[in-house]
Amino acid sequence: MSVSLEEALAQLDPKLRKKLGNGVGVAYEYQPTPSFGLNKALGGGLPYGRQVLIWGSKSSAKSSMCLQMIALAQAEGKLCAWIDSEMSYSEDWARSLGVDPEKLIYSQARTISDMVDVGVGLMNAGVDLIVVDSITSMLPAIYFEKDTDEMKALENTKQIGAESRDFSNAWKMLNYANNKVKPTLLVLISQSRNNINAMYTSQQPSGGQATKFYSSCVIKLFSSESDNQAIKGKIKVGDKLIEEKVGRKIKWELQFSKTSPGFQSGEYDFYFRGDSIGLDTVGDLVDTAELSGLVERTGAWYLLPDGTKVQGRDGFINRVREDLNLQEDLRKKLS
């Protein structure tokens, strides 16, 4: 015979009872990314109090997307930190994406142990958002404690698995430290690697299986570097306008999510030159509105909810970019 919740709790030790409750009211705050389409797939954004993995091919703007997300978080009064192991952080580039470097905590980390020490310290200090760029560049501390000859001797020993073991322990310690002071969003950036153990070559993130296991969301970003996939625009050189590459299309794939339905995908435009730098939030909003059926398209013509027709995607994006009220209306209807 089953007992009620109240009867079960009444039989417990009073100290233990204080730590228990029911499943009502367990909610998370979400940090929006700069992509409206990705936010919609995530159920609002990335969850605070959780670990998130963003990985993919080089030049897929993983770091830049995270910098734009930091800019959004700073605008909401959040305290953010950047742990840099690639030594690729640029103050000028961060500013161009909307980040306030004066309000950004910055730290370098060579080893996995360094990252854990800094990460736990930042969580205990009450930092809201931490980005690690990237875990691919980090090494176990053992590589810095041995000289070259000793490392050669270690290549054929169990130390060859030190990286995966250290990462596994790192995620345990960081997840244990999280939520003690406040829920911190921990974002891990990883480059893609070839899995040579499979029958066919496949891509996977760094850090071993534990990295994905401890991540509440796994997002893959990828893009093509081919010339025909590049976004081109007119760049003024002297008194002439020359057509050059100004951006590329970035595809995203929500491979796994504990807080929303996974296995969703989409794409957005990313610009590294020109008048608009970074992820094109307006273009992303327009594409999401079309996919959701809020905006109809017939051939090259787009039909707005008020019946107005606009020709071409670029023309429609420019129309929405200039009309802030229309932007807000689309966002509200898509939320």
Positions of PLM-derived features:
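Phosphate-binding/switch region of NTP-binding enzymes
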Residues: 159-292
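Terminal-proximal interaction/regulatory segments of ATP-powered molecular machines
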Residues: 300-335
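Residue-level signature of catalytic and energy-coupling elements of molecular machines
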Residues: 38, 53, 94, 133, ...
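The Walker A/P-loop phosphate-binding site
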Residues: 2-104, 117-121
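Catalytic phosphate/metal-binding cores of nucleic-acid and nucleotide-processing enzymes, i.e., regions
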Residues: 52-55, 75-77, 180-183, 221, ...
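Conserved inter-motif catalytic segment of the P-loop NTP-binding fold
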Residues: 57, 68, 76-169, 173
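Long, well-ordered amphipathic alpha-helical subdomains in the mid-to-C-terminal portions
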Residues: 280-310
